[in-house]
């Protein structure tokens, strides 16, 4: 009997193969993206120490008041702008983008564009 492969399991496998090549340092931390059906999350991680330096999501109070929907491209762009603003405040300008096994398309691409608009370089 042929079983249907789970999409999330395949994404996790892709993410592990990507993570072998992508590594965040103090000078260039990793901007990691995770998305669920209703929300999108982004965090900047220093892999040397294993610490999250900056985080933002559609669950943040700053965005919840202004967003009508949390699952569309506009919300993803706002999360990108917010994480970019917070990173610049902490002195982080260059990052390595980790798309989390997702295609660089739709909400993931919009988050990246929002972060670039805020001043992050990748």
UniProtKB/Swiss-Prot annotation:
Against NCBIfam families, the record matches this protein to:
L18_bact
Q: Which UniProt keywords apply?
A: Ribonucleoprotein, Ribosomal protein, RNA-binding, rRNA-binding
Molecular function as annotated in GO: 5S rRNA binding; structural constituent of ribosome
Q: Name one Pfam family in it.
A: Ribosomal_L18p
What family name appears in the similarity comment? Belongs to the universal ribosomal protein uL18 family.
**Signal peptide (residue range):** none
Tell me if Lyase is a UniProt keyword of this record: no
Instruction: Please report the name of this protein according to its UniProt entry.
Output: Large ribosomal subunit protein uL18
One GO biological process from the UniProt record?
A: translation
HAMAP family, alphabetized: Ribosomal_uL18_B
- Organism from which the protein derives: Thermosipho melanesiensis (strain DSM 12029 / CIP 104789 / BI429)
Its job: This is one of the proteins that bind and probably mediate the attachment of the 5S RNA into the large ribosomal subunit, where it forms part of the central protuberance.
Q: Which InterPro entries match?
A: Ribosomal_uL18_bac-type, Ribosomal_uL18_bac/euk
Q: Self-association or partners: how does it assemble?
A: Part of the 50S ribosomal subunit; part of the 5S rRNA/L5/L18/L25 subcomplex. Contacts the 5S and 23S rRNAs.
- PANTHER family referenced in this protein's UniProt entry, alphabetically: 39S RIBOSOMAL PROTEIN L18, MITOCHONDRIAL (PTHR12899), LARGE RIBOSOMAL SUBUNIT PROTEIN UL18M (PTHR12899:SF3)
Q: Which Gene3D superfamilies match?
A: 3.30.420.100
Q: Which GO terms describe its cellular component?
A: cytosolic large ribosomal subunit
């Amino acid at each position: 009997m042929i079983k249907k492969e789970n999409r999330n399991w395949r994404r996790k496998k892709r993410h592990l193969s990507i993570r072998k090549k992508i590594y965040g340092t103090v000078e260039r931390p990793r901007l990691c993206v995770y998305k669920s059906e209703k929300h999108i999350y982004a965090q900047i991680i220093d892999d040397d120490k294993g610490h999250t330096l900056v985080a933002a999501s559609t669950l943040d109070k700053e965005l919840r008041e202004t967003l009508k929907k949390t699952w569309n491209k506009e919300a993803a762009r706002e999360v990108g702008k917010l994480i970019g603003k917070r990173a610049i405040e902490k002195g982080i300008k260059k990052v390595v983008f980790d798309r989390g096994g997702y295609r660089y398309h739709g909400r993931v691409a919009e988050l990246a564009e929002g972060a670039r608009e805020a001043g992050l370089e990748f």
